[in-house]
Amino acid sequence: MAETLTLRATLKGHTNWVTAIATPLDPSSNTLLSASRDKSVLVWELERSESNYGYARKALRGHSHFVQDVVISSDGQFCLTGSWDGTLRLWDLNTGTTTRRFVGHTKDVLSVAFSVDNRQIVSGSRDKTIKLWNTLGECKYTIGEPEGHTEWVSCVRFSPMTTNPIIVSGGWDKMVKVWNLTNCKLKNNLVGHHGYVNTVTVSPDGSLCASGGKDGIAMLWDLAEGKRLYSLDAGDVIHCLCFSPNRYWLCAATQSSIKIWDLESKSIVDDLRPEFNITSKKAQVPYCVSLAWSADGSTLYSGYTDGQIRVWAVGHSL
């Protein structure tokens, strides 16, 4: 019996692209977060019933431009956002208020991440720098020239490994870079992409990194060795990548569909294309730009350019 994914529900609340989705680490949590070009972050309460999968419980407002990224703290109490207004914000999810503003980037913030212990924050920006912050909103370090990216920094992620703490970044200079967190020095340049890199993601055990972007190729890297292991052809621009938390799967949100690979066999598990009611010939078919798995790996949340979150459930097909 093969595992496949079925469209379970659609969450409607945003009025513009769903740019990022964050799920809590606690599998029993009923919260989901989504960031959007409508300048808000929605806090969803998931009921998972047939009639009502979930509703937007709260809207976090304060950014003056598109919210490009959102991540949730490991205790589920706070979230962090990055916006095209050039700032980061730390939000208290219980009150829905901003507790910190992080000011320092000179252009749009494209990506944010929390360290495993939530004590450090990293951000990537169109100003071509990577900044490291503490939770008080103080910038502790800026990575720029000569080791940094020479174009926009599109994505930054911490490795879950606490023994050898590293940051992975991707940029529009076609580079994936691995940074040593202890001294913010460059550990490896991962070279191979032929177009800008939109997304990088680190596997749950911290051993692998996957990157993707304009060239439509998902590249898998060994983080300890700094070497490319293999490539998977998605056949279209990759907007987002994420590893399953409990299966050896990699998911790619592309311009045409969501592809899911089994990394053991390097074969496609599923290719997800929802049906859209396109009324006019000129209408752009919505596509997926953000992905997140539930903590238990049973549900995949996907954010689309039509402002909707489509919820996919993993099940068996005979």
From Swiss-Prot:
WD repeats lie at residues 13-45, 62-92, 104-134, 148-180, 192-222, 233-262, 283-313. The keyword Repeat applies. It comes from the Eukaryota. Keywords: Repeat, Ribonucleoprotein, Ribosomal protein, WD repeat. GO terms for molecular function: ribosome binding; translation regulator activity. The keyword Ribonucleoprotein applies. InterPro entries: G-protein_beta_WD-40_rep (IPR020472), RACK1-like (IPR045223), WD40/YVTN_repeat-like_dom_sf (IPR015943), WD40_repeat_CS (IPR019775), WD40_repeat_dom_sf (IPR036322), WD40_rpt (IPR001680). One of its GO terms (cellular component) is ribosome. It holds the Pfam family WD40. PANTHER family: RECEPTOR FOR ACTIVATED PROTEIN KINASE C RACK1. Belongs to the WD repeat G protein beta family. Ribosomal protein RACK1 subfamily. This is Small ribosomal subunit protein RACK1.
